[in-house]
């Protein structure tokens, strides 16, 4: 007796006809449709939301009306809860947004009633308003301190050539010196001058008239680089040297650095005749820990 354990490779009839089993094999569909097949066979329906929406923002729970989330059409929240996009839910059925929810309550309060955060939270809420693209909230916050003052400060710094580059240079020089010396802090010299030609006759006011008698060819005699690590200036604005020093300390402190500075004199380099450079030199002390 012969036991057949398999089927002949070619089970089709010689006349080209197929058996019923052959037909079933040829039209057998996979148990799980592929993404392409599913997209054609089962188009996704718009997601529907309840009138009262439970939210999970990075683990922080909130509850609000659907109309509140949609109150400004051109925002990320309005788009997310328009039904055109799928939003996952957590185990409790709350709609989940993978974002830190610390300041989302301030965002909701603005959407609900136009309330604005206190000054100490303005910067943090501004970042959330940027993320959720809430234009009206951004406009309101930009007119509050400290952002309003920051706009004025940046307008001044916009007149300062290479301000950001020089700021980074201060940090890099201080870091390298601290590493090389195995020291807790590093010192460097910074020249800050406002005027285009911060040069005066040395200890002789009567020679001030010579300042205006120089020819254009003499200008090259007055051009030089002070022996410092970084120089800032000149600029044309009401803000003076002390305002720029305040900006430097503010921006360096924002990087977590401890900054001290003091004026240690002027360049005092002899240029020509009775003229010496009177650009002020400041010593910056950057403490790393």
Curated annotation (Swiss-Prot):
GO BP of this protein: intracellular glutamate homeostasis; intracellular potassium ion homeostasis; membrane hyperpolarization; protein homooligomerization
Entry's Gene Ontology molecular function annotations: identical protein binding
Effect listed in the UniProt record for changing residue 84 to W: Found in a patient with opsoclonus-myoclonus ataxia-like syndrome; likely pathogenic
InterPro entries xref list: BTB/POZ_dom, SKP1/BTB/POZ_sf, T1-type_BTB
Alphabetical list of SMART domains matching this protein: BTB
Entries under SUPFAM superfamilies matching the protein: POZ domain
CDD domains: BTB_POZ_KCTD7
GO cellular component: cytoplasm; cytosol; plasma membrane
Limits of the BTB domain: 51-149
Positions of the UniProt region annotated as Disordered: 1-35
Pfam assignment, any one: BTB_2
Compartment annotation: Cell membrane; Cytoplasm, Cytosol
UniProt keyword list: Cell membrane, Cytoplasm, Disease variant, Epilepsy, Membrane, Neurodegeneration, Neuronal ceroid lipofuscinosis
Disease linkage: Epilepsy, progressive myoclonic 3, with or without intracellular inclusions: A form of progressive myoclonic epilepsy, a clinically and genetically heterogeneous group of disorders defined by the combination of action and reflex myoclonus, other types of epileptic seizures, and progressive neurodegeneration and neurocognitive impairment. EPM3 is an autosomal recessive, severe, form with early onset. Multifocal myoclonic seizures begin between 16 and 24 months of age after normal initial development. Neurodegeneration and regression occur with seizure onset.
Record's function text: May be involved in the control of excitability of cortical neurons.
Record's subunit section: Interacts with CUL3.
PANTHER family given in the database record: BTB_POZ DOMAIN-CONTAINING PROTEIN KCTD7 (PTHR14499:SF122), POTASSIUM CHANNEL TETRAMERIZATION DOMAIN-CONTAINING (PTHR14499)
Name listed for the protein in its UniProt record: BTB/POZ domain-containing protein KCTD7
Gene source species: Homo sapiens (Human)
């Amino acid at each position: 007796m012969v036991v057949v354990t398999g089927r002949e490779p070619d089970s089709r009839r010689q006349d080209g006809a197929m058996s019923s089993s052959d037909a079933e094999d040829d039209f057998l569909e996979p148990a799980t449709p592929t993404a392409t097949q599913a997209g054609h066979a089962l188009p996704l329906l718009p997601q529907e939301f309840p009138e009262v929406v439970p939210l999970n923002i990075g683990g922080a729970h909130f509850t609000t009306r659907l109309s509140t989330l949609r109150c400004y059409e051109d925002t990320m929240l309005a788009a997310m809860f328009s039904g055109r996009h799928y939003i996952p839910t957590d185990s409790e059925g709350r709609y989940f947004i993978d974002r830190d929810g610390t300041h989302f309550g301030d965002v909701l309060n603005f959407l609900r009633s136009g309330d604005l955060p206190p000054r100490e939270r303005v910067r943090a809420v501004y970042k959330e308003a940027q993320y959720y693209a809430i234009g009206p909230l951004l406009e309101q916050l930009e007119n509050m301190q400290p952002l309003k003052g920051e706009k004025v400060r940046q307008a001044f710094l916009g007149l300062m050539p290479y301000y950001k580059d020089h700021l980074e240079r201060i940090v890099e020089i201080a870091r390298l010196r601290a590493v090389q010396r195995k020291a807790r802090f590093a010192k460097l010299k910074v020249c800050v001058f406002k005027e285009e030609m911060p040069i005066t006759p040395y200890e002789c006011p009567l020679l001030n008239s010579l300042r205006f008698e120089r020819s254009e060819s003499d200008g090259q005699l007055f051009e030089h680089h002070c022996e410092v690590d970084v120089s800032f200036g000149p600029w044309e604005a009401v803000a003076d040297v002390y305002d720029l020093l305040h900006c430097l300390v503010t921006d360096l402190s924002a990087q977590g650095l401890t900054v001290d500075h003091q004026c240690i004199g002027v360049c005092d380099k002899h240029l020509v005749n009775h003229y010496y450079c009177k650009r002020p030199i400041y010593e910056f002390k950057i403490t790393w820990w």
